[in-house]
């Protein structure tokens, strides 16, 4: 794996075969079950990247939900009953048009969701061939813009504390654009801004949100 991407010299079948052999070797040598699970996660990654259809997206959320449950079980064995996880907004949102990670987990666990959004962001994104590009995006989110105009670098809003009838409550309940950037860059992001935005009411998706006025790109340390 190079910069988080599989070496393209290996085919799907070769990657899967290599990992299956590694898993079998670990099982025969009776290695720690955690290590075997990590190999299973790599197998999941190979499978998801191989599937380019809608089934692949659904499979990804299914695997994420399974892995979160696995992590929680490990934490519970150590005497704790809560975990804090970080995921893309669409995977943790309380509502979605497909079986997202949250939808799957919400059938088993209580779940408190913190969303994030930006007014302006510069992102360091992979664009294929192990190259990266820094691109600028705007969410067009009114609450994020308010954070910027109020001169806040960051702002946290607990939606449960908003009073009915107030302007901020109306904006939080209303449909608005929110940034939803993924882990890669496409020319479509530049020519078709809705490709990196979703149009939903913030209070429908999250229990509260963190707004960032100007987000800076991640610095990759070689």
What are these regions, as identified by a protein language model?
Residues 1-222:
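Structured catalytic-domain cores with a bias toward divalent-metal coordination
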């Amino acid at each position: 794996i190079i910069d988080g991407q599989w070496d393209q010299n290996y085919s799907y079948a070769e990657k899967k075969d290599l990992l299956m052999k590694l898993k079998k070797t670990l099982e025969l040598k009776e290695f720690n079950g955690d290590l075997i699970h990590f190999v299973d996660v790599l197998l999941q990654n190979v499978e998801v990247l191989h599937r380019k259809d809608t089934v692949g997206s659904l499979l990804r959320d299914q695997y994420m939900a399974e892995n979160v449950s696995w992590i929680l079980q490990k934490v519970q064995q150590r005497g704790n009953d809560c975990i804090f996880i970080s995921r893309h907004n669409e995977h943790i949102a309380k509502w979605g048009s497909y079986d997202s990670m949250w939808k799957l987990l919400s059938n088993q666990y209580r779940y408190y969701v913190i969303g994030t959004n930006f007014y302006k962001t510069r992102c360091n994104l992979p664009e294929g061939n192990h190259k990266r590009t820094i691109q600028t995006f705007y969410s067009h989110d009114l609450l994020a813009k308010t954070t910027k105009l109020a001169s806040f670098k960051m702002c946290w809003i607990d939606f449960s504390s908003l009073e009915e009838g107030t302007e901020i409550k109306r904006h939080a309940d209303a449909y608005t654009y929110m940034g939803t950037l993924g882990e890669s860059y496409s020319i479509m992001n530049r020519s078709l801004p809705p490709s990196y935005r979703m149009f939903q009411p913030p209070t429908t998706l999250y229990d509260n949100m963190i707004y960032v006025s100007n987000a800076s790109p991640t610095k990759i340390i070689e």
